[in-house]
Amino acid sequence: MKQVTEQAEDFVDTRSSGTEIREFEDLRSDSSQIRMFDTWEDYGLKEDLLKGIYSIGFETPSFIQKAAIQPIIDGRDIRAQAQSGTGKTGAFAVAALQICDMSQDVTQILVLASTREIAAQNAARFEDLGCFMGARVALLSGGSPIAADKVALEKKPHIVVGTPGRVEHMININELSMDNIKLFVIDEADEMLKAGFQEQVKSIFRRITNKDEVQIAMFSATYDEEELRVSEEILINPVIIDLRYNDQTLKGIRQYFIDLRKEPPFRKGREDYLLPKLVTLYDIFRKQRLGQSIVFINSKEDARIVYDWLIRHEWECELISAELTQAERERTLNRFRGGTGRCLISSGLLSRGIDIQNLSVVFCLDVPSFERKSTYIHRIGRSGRYGRKGIAINIVYEHELKNLKAIERFYNTTIKELPADFSFQ
């Protein structure tokens, strides 16, 4: 497979079943072509949108942005797949703001996300990019008062970003109109098309007045066969963007494991079971000079154990899990983003979509089941974002290696045993 040259990147081919864009394939020409551009000016974007783009430091489009923005502007459905941290949110936000008519006091863009944290981050990106355009953005999600959402919708937002449950509720009580939707964005689409969200997403889609004409854009780092099947029911002649970099090997992230061999033979509870992992983690913290890191573990109960143990050993950290209120989670994230705390313990809420700029290392204290293998990709994708280098360390027992190796084979990636003399510098 050849790497695409800069000249070849300018065009991709359109087929009768849709358009497919792959970064590391020869691009075959066809009668109709979609143009990709190297600079923001080349897109012919609104002047005030360009100001917003440059004000937040977007110097040039990333590859996913090159591939996705123009098809959306041209009115095409798209299904985009790209590794975490490549600029997917910026891609659909820029395109949406370009096609949105700010002179119309109606909601034209609807963006769904699986968690409030991701929805809030997406809404903030729209606000930042649209700050010179007069773009009005409303965030609708569980955990906030219904009354506050009603007030937000009374301001006639151009763009609504939210979680499926709250968005559906606001539609049902006639507070959110679907009469003028131009673009329906499904972020973290692999999660949104799973059984837990799928019916809500379909229900919301059915409520869009002009659903035969509305554009749909799906973005994710992973899709499985069932999710692809569901997407085919919704999308019409889509542009398919697949930028996974050789079957999900996450570019720029070095992946390692530490094999602790047998789990403790005698234990009274979960802390005893986790103790060898906690000691190993603490030893790394003490001996290495690390920037900020995230520690992932599957359950909120285990996350609390890890947090309490580190606090008892006087290691500065933060905890974010489902046991916290929404307000507490937001305060925790804001503190951590602001540089408070060396590490953040997460039960999984942060494995998707959340962007923490200065994160250098991700630690995984357990391995997701093979059925939830995409969780691994989303976890380690918190490091190495936007082309920066990252490190992922899996601290595991012998029996967990089977799952880790199965994930390694499935994604055609490399997870090495951590060398004894490894330096995080």
Swiss-Prot record:
Keywords: ATP-binding, Cytoplasm, Helicase, Hydrolase, Initiation factor, Nucleotide-binding, Protein biosynthesis, RNA-binding. One of its GO terms (cellular component) is cytosol. ATP binds at A82, Q83, S84, G85, T86, G87, K88, T89. Pfam families: DEAD, Helicase_C. A motif (Q motif) lies at residues 38-66. InterPro entries: DEAD/DEAH_box_helicase_dom, DEAD_box_RNA_helicase, Helicase_ATP-bd, Helicase_C-like, P-loop_NTPase, RNA-helicase_DEAD-box_CS, RNA_helicase_DEAD_Q_motif. CDD domains: DEADc_EIF4A (cd17939), SF2_C_DEAD (cd18787). The Q motif is unique to and characteristic of the DEAD box family of RNA helicases and controls ATP binding and hydrolysis. This is ATP-dependent RNA helicase eIF4A. It comes from Encephalitozoon cuniculi (strain GB-M1) (Microsporidian parasite).
